[in-house]
Every structure is written in C-alpha cells, then in structure tokens.
From Swiss-Prot:
It comes from Simian immunodeficiency virus (isolate GB1) (SIV-mnd). Residues 1030-1153 form the RNase H type-1 domain. Gag-Pol polyprotein and Gag polyprotein may regulate their own translation, by the binding genomic RNA in the 5'-UTR. At low concentration, Gag-Pol and Gag would promote translation, whereas at high concentration, the polyproteins encapsidate genomic RNA and then shut off translation. Matrix protein p17 has two main functions: in infected cell, it targets Gag and Gag-pol polyproteins to the plasma membrane via a multipartite membrane-binding signal, that includes its myristointegration complex. The myristoylation signal and the NLS exert conflicting influences its subcellular localization. The key regulation of these motifs might be phosphorylation of a portion of MA molecules on the C-terminal tyrosine at the time of virus maturation, by virion-associated cellular tyrosine kinase. Implicated in the release from host cell mediated by Vpu. Residues 513-584 form the Peptidase A2 domain. Residues 1379-1426 bind DNA. One of its GO terms (cellular component) is membrane. Residues 204-226, 444-494 are annotated as: Disordered. This is Gag-Pol polyprotein. A motif (Nuclear localization signal) lies at residues 26-32. It holds the Pfam family rve.
Length: 1441
C-alpha cells in the first residue's frame, strides 16, 4: 500500500490506516491525511521529508508543540497527525490520536525538564563549581530600546520584556531600565511601584539576618532585591544557595512587570467592559479593539479566557450577538469571524463584496447561465480565454475594455454617457428613495434618473430661510403637474410613513406576496413556503438572522410593484419575512428622502461609571387604568420612533408609573431614573443660572421662540440606550410585559439637560456668527431674540433661525411663536421698553397651613422680591424652623399674618423694570427696611433695572453694618453674573461710622467701592465703643454668678467711687447674670461710662456692636447703649488684686459659688508690662490657661492687634517646605522654611537663577527630609533645573501666587522676620552673608515659642523623632497579628476562635473573628502564639506584648 512519496510504506501505512481519528470514533486515518500534513508543514517552513523518520517528527514537534494550547484547529490536527506518525516510527502501540498525544507529551515534557535543568543562562557554573556571571548582551538591550521606542507602552511590550530578561539578575534588569531612561514619566511610575513592593517586602520579612562573621549571607531587604544596595556577587549567592535560595532576579522582575501593567493601563484607560461593538461596526474591527484592550488588563490567563468566551459575545451588537449565540459555546474565533463577516456598514459590505468578486474572478470555475440567454461561451476550468462581462467577447476582462459600459451612467442611468461625464452635480449622485409628494399615473421608464425637470432634485436639509416653505411648494407643484397629465421619464414610489413597517403587495412572476421594503437589505429574498419559482437556480449562502442561510438564487425574475416592474435577482430560502432589497428598488428608481433629519444631530457619547452595570429594578404593580394609559403613551412614542422594543437578552429595567395631568383625564408617564442616574457618569452643568431681563440690552425688535419636544428631538447614544429599558406590565400577568427603551433623551435622566443645552448651543453658534449684533438668549428650549433691525430684517433673521433649527429636526411650534408684545419668557413679561414679572397671586392661607404651603408662599415672595421692594419673609420663615415634615401643620402667628398682608399689598401695586443701557452709569442703592433686612435696587438714572433684599443672619446677635457688608458682597456677585462688572454702591451711612466699624472688622473679605449716603435711622441705631478708658468718668466693675443646682443667681456692680448695687434672680444662668450686671451698670450710669467685666461671653457679644438680636436681655442692653455718648468696655480676670473686680466678685459670689484664686496672674501681668512677653512665655512660666494668657496680651495697648485675618489651611505635613527669594542690600537671599516646625535655612546666592536654586535645594535635601516643595511661580522655580532636581529627589513641587498669603504665607512671614533679625545684628557683621547665618542661628535656636514651647531646631528634631517612634510603634502593633485569640461570649461556655488579635488592653482585647470586630474581656479569652511553642511559654510571651 502507498506510493514512493508517502512518509509511511508497507506495514507502517497499514498500521496508520487502522488508527482512529478520535477515541471511540469510526473514522480512521487515510493516505489523504498524510498528503494534507505535508502541505501544512510547508506553511511552517519545514520539509515534508522530516515525516519519514522518528527524529524528523520530533523536530517538527519541537517547533509546533509550544503553540499547541493557543493554536488553531488546523495546528492541533497537524500535531496530532505528526504524533501518530512518530509513534508508528518508534513502534509504540496506539489506537487513536489521543493515545499518541498522551505518550508523546510525556516524552516531550521529560526532555523539556532536562533542558530546563541544564539551562541556567546568564549564570554558568565553571569546572571548580563556582558561579560565573555573563552580563546581558548589547543586542538584547538594543532590541529592548527599539521596542520601547516603536511600541511605547503598549500591552505587547510586557511579554517581550519577560522573554528578553529570562534568567536575568537584578543588575541586568536595572541596566534594561536605565537604557530607556528618557521616558522619565514611565520610569517614575516604575520607581513608585518598585518602592511600594520593596516596602511591602520589608514589612512581610521583618526579621533581617545580618551578615555572619564566618561569611554567612544576610537576608536580602527590598532595596537589595532591587539591586540598589547589593552587589552582583550577593545576588548570585542568594539565587544559588543550597537551602532556602531566594531568586532575587525573578522577584525584582515581577515588581517591574507589575509597574509595567500599571503603565499599560494608564496608556489604555478603557476598561474591557466598556468595549462594545457599534451598530454598524464590522465584527473583525470590534474583535481587534477587544483584544487590544484585553492585553492591557491585569488579569490571569483563566480570567482572560473567560472574557473571550463571555464578554466578547455579550458586548457585541444585537445582530452579531444573535449569530454568535447560535454557534454555541464551543465556537472558535475563526468560526465567529466567518459567521459574522457579513455584519457591518455599507462600506464594510462593499469591501467584502469586492473581495469576494476578486476571489471569484481569480479562480477558474465554470459559470453556467441557468436562466435567460447566455452572455458568452461557458467558461472552462483551464485553457480558455477570459470573457468580458461588458461586451461578452473573449480575450479580455471588463476592466481593460475601453468602450462605454452597457448599462450607461451609474449616476442618472442615461445610456449616452458615463458617470464621469454626468451633467448632474455631485450632490445629486446619492440614491434617494421615498419621495415626499403624492404620485399620479405615470409611465414606467427604464431608469429613474432620466427625468430632467427641476423637481427631480433631492430635498435636503437646507439652511436657507425658505427651507420649511420650500418643501410644501415642491409638493404643490408636483401635484399640479401630476393632475395636468404631464408625462415623466422616471418612476418613484409614493410616500411611506415610517410610523409602521413599510409593507407593500408585490407580484413575483405573477404570484402576489406582501413584502417589506428594506433599504438596508442588499438582496431581495422570499420565503420558500410563500412562492415556488420555476427554472434553473444556483445555490448560495447568505448571512441571515440566527446565522447563515442556504438559499436558491434565481436570475431574471420579473418583480412588479403597483403596476411598475423590472427584472432582477431573487433569492428563495427560509427567511422569517419577505424582503424587497435595494437590488430591485434601485432598478425601479426608488429614492430615499429623509424628511426626518435627526441623524444629522451629533451623538454625545455616554457611559456608565467604571466598574458598574445598568439598573435591574423590578417594576412595581400598577392599576389597570394606569397600565392602559401607559400602553397608549408607549404606542404613540413607538410610532414616533422615540422609543423602540428591547431585545429579549436585555436584562436591565427601570420602573415606571403614571399620574393624571392637571384638570385632565389624560395620563402622564413618569420613569424613576434615580438608580440609573447614580450609575451614569457625571455631567457638568453647562448653564449655572437663568438669564435675567435686567441684563438684556434695550432693543427695538423682540421675538420669543420655544423648541417643541425639546428632549425628544435629540437622539440618545445608541450604546447607552439598552440601560434605559423599562417594562409595561399586563393585568393579572395575562401576558409578558412589553419592554421598551429610549431612542431620545428621556425626561428625568441626569444627562438630558446638559446634552440638550450643548447640542442646541453648537447649532446656534452658526446663527450667532452670521448675526453678531443680535441678542440670542438660550435657556433649555426657550429662545429670546432681540435686535435693532428693521421689521423685515428681523423677520428674515427669525425665519433663518427657524430654518437652521429645522436642519436638525428641531421644530419651533407656531403656538409658542411670539411675535407681538407682551412676550412671556422665563416667568417674565417682556415689552420693547420695559419688563415685568408675571402676575403673582398669593394663595389664601388658613389659620393652620402646612409646611409645604408656607414653602411655596415663601418661594413666590422671593421670586417677586427681584422687582417689588419691601417684601419680607422673616416671620413666615420662623413658622417652619426645625426639621418639620412637609405635611405638618403650623399655626400662624400675628407677626406672620401681618407680614403676609403687607406683602399682599405690595404685590397689588404693579412694578416695572428697565433694560440695561450701556451708555449710562449703573449703580446700586441700599436701604434698611423696618423688619431689619437690607433692600437694594440696581438703577440707571431714575429707572430701576431690578431689586433685591438681603436678610442673612449667621449669628444670634448682628449689626446693620455687618449685614450691609454681606449685602454688598451679594450684589457684587450677582452684578458680575448679569452685567460682567461691579457697579458703584450707595450705602446708607456716614463715612465716620463706616470707618469706625471697618477699623475693627477689616477682615470681612472683599468690599467694593462705596458712596456714602447719610441716613438718620442708621445713624441713630449706631453706638460707639471707645478703645481707651475715659478719663474722669466713673468706672463700673460688673459681675454675675449663678448656682447650677438651685438656679439662684446674683448680678451687680461696684464703682471706683464706692457705689454698689446687687440684685438677685431666680431660674437663671451664669451667662444671664453677667448680662444683667452690664444692664444694671448702664441703667445707673451717665452718658459716658467705663465698664469692666470678667466675662468673655459678654465682651464677645458687645464688642461686635450688635443692633439686632433675639435675646431679650441683649436687646435691652443695645437700647441702653444707643443712649450713651461714649462707652469703654474692658475685660479683666476675676482674681484678687485687680481693681474693684475682686470686690464685686465677692459680693455676687456670696452664697452662690466658690471663687477660685490664682496667684500667678498678677506676676504674669507685671512681667508682660516689663518685657511684653508673648502668650507662650506666659503659659510656660506662670502655668496660666491659654485663654487667660491671650487676654493679658490683648489687654496691652502696645501688643493688641485690631482683628486677625481670616486664615486658610496650609499643608503642614512633616516633609513640606516652602522656599522663596527675598532681596536686601541689593543682594539675593534664598530662604527655606519647614512649614510644620518653622525651622529656617537661608543663605546669600549670587544670582536668582534655576541653577543656583537647584543647588540650594540639593544641599537642603542632603540635610533634612523633603517630600513636598511649595514655591511661587517665579522663573527660577519653574526652570528645568529645579524640575529635574525635584524629579531626581522624588519631591512633589507645587506652585502658588506671589504675595498671596494663602500661597506662601509661612515663608513670606519668615522673610520679614529674618530681615528684622538681620537689622538688629547688622552692626556686628562685616558682610551680609555672615549676618544671614547669625540671624538664622538666632531664629532656630534662640527663639522659643509655638507648638510645645520649643525652639524651631528642637521642634523639627522632635517631629522627626516622633514620626520614627510612630513608625516603630506601628511595626510593634503589626506583631500582634502573630497572636491568635480563643474566647467565650456571654453564657456560652464553648470556646470560639481562633481570632486575630488587633489590640490588647488592661481589661479587654479587640479581635477580628469571621470579618467581625469584637471586644472581649481579658478574663474570657486566651491568647496564644501562632507558631510552635508550649502553652506555658506562649502565655508568658503574651503578657510581654
């Protein structure tokens, strides 16, 4: 058996043909399998002679075996066949391919194991048994560098790096990384990952064995593994130890690969779950994207295999998903690609058809004409000349034939020219379909393009003003011509509504069939049960629903629609629906005119948040009437194309419900998108507020438009639509619920406002460029258009705007098109010369209205306050203070009822606002209302543009000037938003009162330019506090005391002239008695008075000069203070020796409370008077509380500071430094300050350059730890030298703003202090650099204070020491993890455990048991070590933890 060319001869071939292909199968190997095997070997560049010997077969397997697991089915079949041949050569008895694979696999693994044992490059053992190191070759380094330069950091870089560094040590790996050091960002990422892994290694291997005196190796640390603190010899020794060898090279390599995975992920931020196939994307392109992203995923091989088997199918588009699921779970990637090759857009299908045609033309096959006249001789397999498909002549093919084609022009169909010479413009070369005017009785022509009249042009989305009218004119003209009986050379279908499927009766060879007109189908196909055609046919396979379909192809079949027919190709097969494809409709002259142009609107891509999936919330029960109402709404929306049915595979759902419309019997559909909104990406609000009429420039012509069906006009991202799925249930579960999803922006979805605003704004930008002088305001779907055009020009601009919107199918309904005043817009009523607020009707309030009714009322009043002055809501808001339910009823007070009636009277008188005139000055005038609020109006001349009020009260006690300052800030912010600048402000007070208050309260942030208008009311309500004691005036020492238990209290005063008064009070507190004491002093004193108190509470209230309060006692004190000419208020601690304060303290304390006596306050005051010591010195030396020491300092007129600025937050971490340059004596001093401790380093530099700054930074980093550097954005700090030094040192560099205290406040303050120190010692120094060094020494080691009362030098050392102790303590705590805890709970006598010890205290322990944290008493637990020691020793060791 066999022939000379066979690899097996005689008996070997007989044995071969008895071996089964599969175990338990019937088919056996044949000679054809050997022939096929030889052909496959040629693909691998292997000779077929290798099959003739056993050694040759083993060589084949050495090449193919490593690819077996990941190889295709052909490769696995080839390996199996070679294994069978090898077993026959070796005389091994086998019965099937699986037996051969099993036996050959064992042999190959043994050989591989032997090879692995002998392969130890780059470490080689010499004859003496010593390990010799072979450095990595330059060729490998060159390959690595070239790969990084070409591939950057794509996923394929990682396996190449792993292959190039096989067996390398840490030294080699560092050489590889240094070779690509130009990639600084990537190297920094790798460095961070290596440092993290090294720290984790040190944490998990805390017991470091030092080097032994006898030459023993130390245990490698994390830095040793990274090769930074170890030598090549040590690395080799660790890798080749006899016992407990540590392969540092492999460990370090895994760290680097971990960092590379992070790099790859940063360069490929798309998650594998986000890779989804587009609706018209080719499956091959989708697979390429999928695998590129999957390579970047940090996952194991099993996980990636699961991704390939599940995610690849689940994320495909519905068409491919249905085909792939029909293939089953075991389908290979090749089978998937073959099955889905027909899925894609028109370009993909055209490319696929071209490739198929090229394949067919290139092959020598018989083409038999099975129906109709033959176009030429039958092509023979070989030895015949080619036939031209154009002229049917032999000797050439169609593409080399120069004569015109038989079918004429591809554009218009005329026979007298080609497409290149077609006179019609390129815009009309598109194939159009449904016409938009009705069709009369016309004669059928050969081609539709032969009609030459002007009406044959395609209706496109024009931007001209006549667009909307142009369509109706064409319709009317076409109808008139049709009625006139004018003949046309072309043929067109009538108009078909897309609210339902376009199905038409079709005659096919005399058989009538109802078929779907499908412009997306390439071919015409009918179900074999509906029609039987006669004649010859050809077999064909096409891609259909559920997979490939085997159909019969009939040529030259006559198809007739509405009396108009043509000949074409028809397919007959098992299709679920009969379809008329483009091949027939094109011959009939079908045109597709897109009356709905929403496909021109750009799609905004939307995604879910990373790591989440869509909502799956069940639909709750609905009543029958709601279900019926919802179904009607959904049917209408589906007809309009705004929603569509959902595939059965969609498992997302969002619940819906229905409510009745106001005063109607119709239902309104609502959908609960709360869960989907949580899962969806965040959107930025494009418009932060509504436009205001006061900011509109006065114009002659106004028009207000509204975009109809605003959200429903903008398409939703097709990839996101499945997440909006919802279900309309049926009553009693009579049938499965109908499932829909949104095709447009849904109401209630978080992204709808942002996407709608952005989409419409991009379209309106065209109009704004064409009409720069026109004011076009857009807020959601409301449009305001104002201009100074003439009436005709303005109307023309409006027509152009509406036509522009229509190009994107954004309609502006006539019923909301406002041409004449008054114009209703955004709640306002607009006129050409004025604007109003739409009439505000206040509802009648009952005696006990609900919280919700009060809230609505306050909202209406606040809306009206922008134009109606004097509106107050303070008393109404008091009714709903606290956490009340919106349905809870409240009782109207007399004040609230009065406020309500006053507001009603104000609203009864209509108010008008004016538009902004850029040529006139804009100013704001403030007034104080009787209710205490601040009202204001924006004015130009005598005209009011708008009004407002300010009643915000942050504290219980406030004054008018503080409230006035807050009002000016509010007005300034609103003015910038509306007009873009801050106008001049007229405040109702005098300059003296304002500056007197402002002197004490300068830190209230920003105040604009003001103009003072004296108002007697505000002057009368103001009172002055003197900063110094009044000479010759009686001094009142006041005090109060109360008993916490009995609530009894006393308050009184004693004067320096011997007068005294003490009153008793019931049910009072200590703070109230202090206030009563001040009140008594004000009642009995004259117009000028000195008051001394020991109450910080009283001073804190009265020092801010409040004029309004809800506190009854404070209110009385304010009224008494207004009647005084001058008041001096001071604070002194209530202790012995301080004036008459001690005496009044004894009077009011008698029988009330026990007075504490502190002897150190008086000496502290004396010391401060002598040396002006700071607070820290007083607290340290005299052991005073911080509050007392601070008050002693602030009571000194020389040390007192008027107010303190509002401070921000400064990063005071341990490693944070601030650096700045200052100038003194025409020289440059660079100053560095440690933010946390205040430690300073300074020196004189020759030039303020990046090089000198970098040198200073390096010297600083060599002495002190730095993790973060903060500077201003000066050129020396932003230079390349400083950035490089920060990168090398691993320092984070941040920038601030020069001279901004919030940016470099610490170093700016030190600059000033350093200069003061230098000034004191400058006379003792010859050179400035010596003075700088001495001043730095004094600051760091001779100035005590701040945190801990230490010097700056002591403080920074203490902080570093504390940080090290903390880290040591954390390490000690981690040792607790070595202990296990067994414990009992409650009355349960059974021991539970073991748990993990987290903390051990004196009476209890904290442990973790089964993911739960427990606190157990020490008497109910036993703690043992986790490793082998006796119970006794374990207990002893435990107590030492």
């Amino acid at each position: 058996m066999g022939n000379g060319n066979s690899a097996l001869l005689g008996t070997d071939l007989d044995k071969f043909e008895k071996i089964r292909l599969k175990r338990g199968g019937k088919k056996c190997y044949r000679l054809k399998h050997l022939c096929w095997c030889k052909g496959e070997l040629d693909r691998f560049g292997l000779s077929d002679k290798l099959l003739e010997t056993q050694q040759g077969c083993e060589k084949i397997l050495s090449v193919c075996w490593p690819l077996y697991d990941q190889g295709s089915d052909n490769l696995k079949a080839l390996v199996g066949t070679v294994c069978v041949v090898a077993c026959i050569h070796a005389g091994i008895e086998i019965k099937s391919t699986q037996d051969a694979l099993k036996k050959l696999k064992v042999i190959t693994r043994k050989e591989e194991k032997q090879e692995d044992e002998s392969k130890n490059f780059p470490v080689q053992r010499d004859a003496a048994g010593q390990y010799q190191y072979t450095p990595i070759s330059p060729r490998i380094i060159q390959t690595w560098v070239k790969t990084v330069e070409e591939k950057k950091w794509k996923p394929e870089v990682i396996p190449l790096f792993s292959a190039l560094t096989e067996g390398a040590i840490s030294h080699d790996l560092n050489i590889m990384l240094n070779a690509v050091g130009d990639h600084q960002g990537a190297m920094q990422v790798l460095k961070d990952v290596i440092n993290e892994q090294a720290a984790e290694w040190d944490l998990t291997h805390p017991q470091q064995q030092p080097a032994q005196p006898g030459g023993g190796l130390r245990t490698p640390s994390g830095s040793d593994i990274a090769g930074t603190t170890s030598t090549v010899e040590e690395q080799l020794a660790w890798m080749n130890m006899q016992q407990n060898a540590i392969n540092v090279g492999t460990i370090y390599k895994s760290w680097i690969i971990l960092g590379m995975n992070r790099l790859v992920k940063s360069h490929c931020p798309i998650s594998i779950t986000d890779v989804r196939q587009g609706p018209k994307e080719a499956f091959k392109d989708y697979v390429d994207r999928f695998y590129n992203v999957m390579r970047a995923e940090q996952a194991s091989g099993e996980v990636k295999m699961w991704m390939q088997q599940h995610l690849l199918i689940e994320n495909a588009n519905p068409e491919c998903k249905q085909i792939l699921r029909s293939l089953g779970k075991g389908a290979t990637l090749e089978e998937m690609l073959e099955a889905c090759q027909g899925v894609g857009g028109p370009q993909h299908k055209a490319r696929l058809m071209a490739e198929m045609m090229r394949t067919v033309v290139g092959q020598s096959q018989n083409f038999v004409q099975q129906r109709g006249p033959q176009r030429g001789p039958v092509r023979q397999p070989t030895g015949r000349k080619p036939i031209c498909f154009n002229c049917n002549k032999e000797g050439h093919v169609a593409r080399f034939f120069k004569a015109p084609r038989r079918k004429g022009c591809w554009n218009c169909g005329a026979m007298d020219h080609q497409k290149a010479q077609c006179p019609k413009p390129a815009q009309q070369q598109r194939v159009n379909f449904f016409r938009v005017w009705p069709l009369g009785s016309l004669q059928t022509g050969e081609l539709s393009g032969t009609r030459g009249d002007s009406n044959s042009s395609t209706i496109r989305g024009e931007t001209s003003a006549e667009n909307s009218e142009h369509l109706s004119e064409i319709r009317e003209r076409a109808q008139a011509e049709d009625e006139g009986g004018e003949e046309r050379g072309g043929f067109s279908f009538p108009e078909y509504s897309l609210s339902r499927r376009p199905i038409e009766e079709v005659s096919v060879d005399g058989v009538t069939i109802r078929a779907l007109l499908d412009t997306g189908a390439d071919d015409t196909i009918f179900n074999e049960r509906n029609i039987k055609l006669k004649g010859n046919w050809q077999p064909k396979i096409i891609g259909g629903i559920g997979g490939n379909l085997r159909v019969k192809q009939y040529d030259n079949v006559y198809v007739e629609i509405r009396g108009k027919g043509t000949f074409g190709t028809v397919l007959i097969g098992p299709t679920p629906i009969d379809i008329i494809g483009r091949n027939i409709m094109e011959k009939l002259g079908g045109k597709l005119i897109l009356a709905q142009l929403s496909d021109k609107i750009p799609i905004t891509k939307v995604k879910l948040k990373p790591g989440v999936d869509g909502p799956r919330i069940k639909q709750w029960p609905l009543s029958k009437e709601k279900i019926v109402g919802l179904q009607k709404i959904c049917d209408r929306l589906e007809e309009e194309g705004k929603i569509s049915r959902v595939d059965p595979g969609n498992n997302y759902n969002t619940p819906i419900f229905a409510i009745k419309k106001k005063d109607k019997n119709e239902w309104r559909k609502l959908i609960d998108f709360r869960e989907l909104n949580k899962l969806t990406q965040d959107f930025h609000e494009l418009q932060l507020g509504i436009p205001h009429p006061a900011g509109i420039k006065k114009c002659k012509r106004i028009t207000v438009l509204d975009i109809g069906d605003a959200y429903f006009s903008i398409p939703l991202d097709p990839d996101y639509r499945p997440y909006t799925a919802f279900t309309v249930p049926s009553v009693n579960n009579q049938a499965p619920g109908k499932r829909y999803m949104y095709n447009v922006l849904p109401q209630g979805w978080k992204g709808s406002p942002c996407i709608f605003q952005g989409t419409v704004a991009s379209l309106l930008e065209v109009f704004r460029k064409n009409h720069p002088t026109v004011q076009l305001y857009q807020y959601m779907d409301d449009l305001f258009v104002g201009s100074d055009y003439t009436a005709e020009e303005h109307e023309k601009a409006i027509v152009e705007l509406r036509a522009l919107l229509m190009t994107w199918n954004l309609e502006t309904p006539e019923k909301k098109y406002q041409k004449e005043p008054p114009f209703h817009w955004m709640g306002y009523e607009l006129h050409p010369d004025k604007w109003k607020i739409e009439k505000v009707q206040l509802p009648e309030l009952a005696e006990q209205p609900t919280v919700n009714e009060i809230q609505k009322l306050v909202g209406k009043l606040n809306w009206a306050a922008q134009l109606y002055p004097g509106i107050k809501t303070k008393q109404l808001c008091k009714l709903i203070r606290g956490g009340l339910n919106i349905t809870e009823k409240v009782t109207m007070t007399e004040e609230a009822r009065l406020e309500y009636e006053q507001n009603k009277e104000i609203l009864a008188e209509e108010q008008e606002g004016s538009y902004y005139d850029p040529n006139k000055e804009l100013y704001v005038r403030f007034q104080k209302t009787t209710g205490g609020d601040i009202s204001f109006q924006w004015k130009q001349g005598n005209k009011v543009l708008r009004a407002g009020k300010y009643g915000k009260q942050k504290t219980a006690h406030s004054n008018d000037l503080m409230k006035l300052a807050g009002a000016t800030q509010k007005v300034g912010r609103e003015s910038i938003v509306i007009w873009g600048f801050v106008p001049k402000m007229q405040i109702p007070t005098t300059r003296e009162i304002w500056e007197d208050w402002w002197h004490e309260y300068w830190q209230c942030t920003w105040i604009p330019e003001v103009e003072f208008i004296s108002t007697p009311m505000l002057e009368r309500e103001w009172y002055s506090l003197s900063p110094e004691p009044l000479e010759g005036v009686e001094t009142y020492y006041v005090d109060g005391a109360a008993n916490r238990d009995s609530k009894m209290g006393k308050a009184g005063y004693i004067t320096d002239r011997g007068f005294q008064r003490v009153e008793e009070y019931l049910n009072t507190t200590n703070q109230q008695t202090e206030l009563h004491a001040v009140k008594l002093a004000l009642e009995d004193s004259g117009s000028y008075v000195n008051i001394v108190t020991d109450s910080q509470y009283v001073v804190g209230i009265l020092a801010s000069r409040p004029t309004e309060t809800d506190h009854p006692i404070v209110k009385e004190i304010i009224e008494l203070m207004k009647g005084k000419e001058k008041i001096y208020l001071s604070w002194l601690p209530a202790h012995k020796g301080i004036g008459g304060n001690e005496q009044i303290d004894k009077l009011v304390s008698s029988g009330i409370r026990k007075v504490l006596f502190l002897q150190n306050i008086e000496p502290a005051q004396e010391e401060h008077e002598k040396y002006h010591s700071n607070e820290a010195q007083l607290r340290e030396k005299f052991h005073l509380p911080a509050l007392v020491a601070k008050q002693i300092v602030q009571s000194c007129s020389k040390c007192c500071h008027h107010g303190e600025p509002i401070k921000g937050q400064t990063d005071a971490s341990l490693g944070v430094w601030q650096i700045d340059c200052t100038h003194l004596e025409n020289q440059i001093i660079i100053v560095a300050v440690h933010v946390a401790s205040g430690f300073m380093k300074a020196e004189v530099i020759t030039a303020e350059t990046g090089k000198k700054t970098a040198e200073f930074l390096l010297k600083l980093a060599a002495q002190w730890p730095i993790s973060k550097l903060h500077t201003d954005n000066g050129p020396n700090f932003t230079s390349q030298e400083v950035e490089t030094m920060c990168w090398w040192l691993g320092i984070e560099h941040t920038f601030g703003i020069p001279y901004n205290p919030q940016s470099q406040g610490v170093v700016e303050n030190k600059n000033k202090y350093l200069k003061e120190l230098i000034e004191k010692i400058r006379e003792d120094c010859k050179e400035l650099k010596t003075a700088v060094a001495m001043a730095t020494f004094i600051h760091n080691f001779k100035q005590r204070g701040g945190l801990g009362g230490m010097t700056a030098g002591e403080r920074i050392v203490n902080m570093i020491n504390t940080e090290l102790e903390y880290q040591y303590q954390q390490n000690q705590i981690s040792k607790n993890l070595n202990f296990k805890v067994y414990f009992r709970e409650g009355r349960d006598q059974l021991w539970k455990g073991p748990g993990i010890l987290l903390w051990k205290g004196e009476g209890a322990v904290v442990l973790k048991y089964q993911e739960e944290i427990k606190i157990v008493p020490r008497r109910k637990c036993k703690i043992i070590k986790d490793y082998g020691e006796s119970g006794k020793n374990s207990q002893v060791n435990l107590e030492s933890v």
